[in-house]
Design a protein with these regions (language model features):
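Gly/Pro-rich cap/lid or specificity-loop segments adjacent to the active site
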Residues: 4-198
């Protein structure tokens, strides 16, 4: 796991974990931004800010899904859009492609692949909390970071400190349902923008 800490300068300052969402983006490399602009001076002076790249993300041990040669072959493949001709066929194609990609990730990443999930990420946060000598975990989570925070709270309710969860995801929705809602929202915004420009 890759970890970065921005020190407040105070001795024995409490720790604030930051997760900007994703999943899939690095937090470690974004820590200077959060410390300089994103959190506000009062927060940066009061807390040591911790950025932790979850397993498979950013500077943590990566997940490999294919060799360079396999990636080149995949990227050079025929790019056809069959959705207009036969939507059901296109859905089946995407599902098969996703299954194939997951199988490649599993075979190229070994046992790590089976532990790339939100529960494992929450457990990793708890391990780092303990290593840093903190009785509770303080978290600022955005988007997917809210789901990670809710998962942590479900696993370790007695260790929840101060949580700010902004832009919360509905944990009862599937990834497909979240994506569909997001697409409808983006489309509505685009239609309003087009209307304003007319």
């Amino acid at each position: 796991l890759a970890l970065a800490i921005h020190r407040s300068g105070q001795k024995d300052a409490p720790v604030l974990f930051v997760n900007p969402g994703g999943p899939g983006g690095t937090v470690v490399s974004a820590l200077p931004y959060y410390a300089a602009l994103g959190l506000g001076e009062s927060v940066v002076k009061a807390y040591d800010i911790v950025a932790l790249d979850p397993r498979g993300v950013g500077a943590s041990t990566p997940v490999f899904c294919m060799t360079d040669q396999e990636r080149d072959q995949r990227n050079a493949g025929e790019d056809t859009d069959t959705a207009d001709d036969n939507p059901q066929s296109a859905i089946a194609e995407v599902k098969e492609d996703s299954r194939s990609l997951a199988d490649g990730c599993r075979s190229h990443s070994g046992s790590l692949f089976e532990h790339i999930d939100t529960v494992s990420a929450a457990r990793d946060f708890d391990m780092v909390r303990a290593v840093l000598g903190q009785e509770t975990l303080n978290l600022l989570g955005y988007s997917y970071g809210t789901f990670l925070g809710a998962t942590y709270a479900g696993l370790f309710p007695e260790r929840v400190g101060r949580f700010v969860l902004d832009g919360a995801l509905d944990p009862t929705l599937s990834v497909n349902e979240v994506s569909a809602l997001q697409m409808r929202g983006l489309d509505a915004s685009l239609q309003h923008w087009i209307s304003d420009c007319a």
